[in-house]
Design a protein with these regions (language model features):
Chain B
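Conserved beta-strand/loop scaffold segments within soluble protein domains that form the structured core
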Residues: 1-206
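A structural signal for the main folded, soluble domain(s) of proteins
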Residues: 138, 151, 319, 326-335
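Charged low-complexity "KEKE/polyampholyte" interaction tracts
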Residues: 164-170, 174-278, 282, 324-335
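Intrinsically disordered, polybasic Lys/Arg-rich low-complexity tracts
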Residues: 274-319
Length: 228, 335
């Protein structure tokens, strides 16, 4: 198994786990005219990375990684799973994390089974754990010999790739502009990854109030292309 | 200055009474209006101080015992004065079997340079009901003081049956976040959150789906089923009083809904106990007439209400009594 190639494959936006069906609130922002052009799309993308992903999904990935490194018991993973579930208040966002986790775990098990991943999938299917994508990703990447730094860099990159792709479809912005945002935020991603491990415990799961409201409003949006 | 507030609400017959409460200066907890007005307990927390000062530490403990019903009110906006060290508030809430606790305080107004940390730990029995709100203003907006405070960290953890079900981690640090930007307050100055944690949460969500169908001009809101037994409403607006009134009306709606549901269940239990169980009824065999049996059965019944609630979500129109429908409509109209 080639770690880099595995990382490129599981992190590909075309990896068929259904991530392209989620906008994580962006669809509400666009329909309400808040994200409406390239500059506002860039602000949205930058704020998402710095204020939402950094304290949430990327932090969950890092926390799961730390548990894996320390060979912590199943109980500790259960606590982390509960914590993430309790933090993800908007129902669509919570469900998105679960759906992606299940499809990611099923698919990767067919490629190269990793025991911890099959256990996690079984627990989710039994209803004992909720299941979250960031944790599933951490488990598989860790078991594939990928480093935490690379896993985080790739995770941020693909999240941002999803954001700009959705912006290109929804706002819409030009494909070139979308790629420019992706490229221009490289330094931000690098900085966030470097600081990830030193995050204070109480900063994990910080809420962005506007983002949460827009995600909740998406449940009631009249016409929509995305599940979240 | 270190202050403590302790409230114990206990049920005696149809009444909820205040027992073993204590407080020290500058705080005071007294009955809100006449104590004979309601069967439930209404208390108001008052303070002789103009607000929270630098170095203040406040410990609040609220215990709502079995089947007790408590509404705790605040007197005025919670003003956070300019600080150097900062102030801390710790709140511990315990709501036992079948209890209801409602607390929707006035907005927190952080003045320039204030530093505040508030941690709320709420333990609920699986059959307990919580109606919990919080509103945060960006400052003394009308004096042109918006997002001038240093740091405000509000952590709320809700446990149901020892399991963490809700964790709201709100850090507002104007140096750290772009508050007027996307993901944050956009053009607004206030944020509001209401949590309803209850075995009846899924049923209430179905009601809200019917009631909250349009947005208001003055503020924007969203609501969601944030856990199998919890509903969350969040809003952003420009008027603290308006958000407070709206959140209070929504909280009152949750209260009426809970009380109504509990009474409905109690009536069913009473009917079952007085009539002989028929063979075709699928209910569990009724045991000997022991008084203790009643509480055990009630708990069981309330636990199964959860699964009933889940199923009920699929039904478009809820079988709610006309009386309650009217009350709900009134509560919304009051807005």
């Amino acid at each position: 198994m080639q770690p880099l190639l595995t990382l490129l494959q599981i992190n590909d936006s075309m990896f068929p786990i259904g991530s392209f069906t989620h906008s994580y609130g962006l669809e509400s922002y666009v329909s309400q005219g808040i994200v409406h052009d390239t500059p506002s799309a860039k602000v949205y993308a930058n704020n998402m990375l710095r204020h939402s992903i950094y304290y949430n999904d990327a932090a969950f990935l890092q926390k799961a990684w730390a548990l894996l490194e320390e060979k912590k018991s199943v109980r500790e993973f259960q606590k982390l799973d509960e914590l993430i579930t309790a933090l993800k208040a908007p129902a669509e966002i919570r469900d998105a994390s679960k759906k992606l986790a299940i499809r990611f775990l099923k698919l990767t098990q067919e490629l190269h089974p990793i025991k911890r991943c099959s256990n996690y999938l079984a627990k989710i299917q039994e209803g004992k754990l909720h299941g979250h994508y960031a944790v599933a990703f951490a488990m598989y990447a860790h078991g594939s010999g990928i480093t935490l730094k690379d896993a985080l860099l790739a995770f941020y990159y693909n999240t941002l790739n999803g954001i700009v792709t959705n912006c290109a479809k929804l706002v819409p912005i030009g494909q070139g502009d979308a790629q420019k945002i992706l490229f221009d935020l490289q330094a931000t991603i690098k900085q966030l990854v470097d600081e990830q491990e030193s995050m204070d415990e109480e900063m994990v799961g910080l809420c962005c109030i506007g983002q949460e409201i827009r995600c909740m409003q998406h449940e009631k949006q009249y016409s929509r292309l995305y599940i979240s | 200055m270190h202050s403590t507030i302790k409230v114990n609400a206990e049920r005696e017959g149809p009444l909820t009474l205040l027992k073993e409460s204590s407080h020290n200066a500058p705080y005071k907890v007294i009955h809100y209006g006449s104590r004979h007005l309601h069967e439930h307990l209404e208390l108001i927390m008052m303070s002789a101080s103009p607000g929270i000062m630098d170095g203040d530490e406040i410990d609040i403990e609220v215990n709502v015992h079995e089947n007790a019903q408590l509404k705790l009110f605040t007197q005025s906006f919670n003003r956070l004065h300019p600080m150097e060290k900062g102030a801390v508030q710790r709140t511990n809430v315990l709501v036992k079997k079948g209890g209801i606790y409602k607390f929707i305080p006035h907005p927190i107004t952080p003045f320039a340079n204030s530093i505040f940390r508030t941690v709320n730990e709420i333990q609920l029995d699986e059959t307990a009901n919580l109606i919990w709100g919080d509103i945060i203003a960006s400052g003394r907006v009308h004096s042109g003081e918006s997002f001038q405070f240093s740091r405000l960290h509000s952590i709320t953890k809700v446990y149901s049956g020892k399991k963490l079900v809700l964790y709201d981690n709100q850090l507002l640090e104007p140096g750290r976040q772009p508050f007027d930007s996307i993901l944050f307050y956009e053009r607004y100055t206030h944020q509001a959150t209401l949590m309803y944690v209850s075995p009846y949460a899924a049923e209430l969500k179905a009601e809200l789906d019917e009631i909250l169908t349009t947005q208001y001009e003055e503020f924007t809101f969203g609501f969601t089923q944030c856990a199998p037994n919890a509903v969350m409403i969040r809003a952003m607006g420009n008027e603290g009083v308006m958000l407070y009134d709206w959140l209070s009306a929504m909280g009152q709606l949750c209260w009426e809904f809970t009380v109504h549901k509990q009474e409905e269940e109690q009536a069913k239990l009473d009917a079952e106990q007085t009539t002989e169980p028929k063979a075709e009824e699928k209910t569990a065999p009724v045991a000997e007439k022991q008084t203790k049996q009643k509480t055990a059965k009630r708990a069981k019944k309330e636990a199964t209400a959860k699964s009933t609630a889940k199923k009920a979500k699929a039904i478009p129109v809820q079988p709610v009594g006309e009386e309650l429908e009217e009350e709900l409509a009134e509560a919304v109209a009051e807005k």
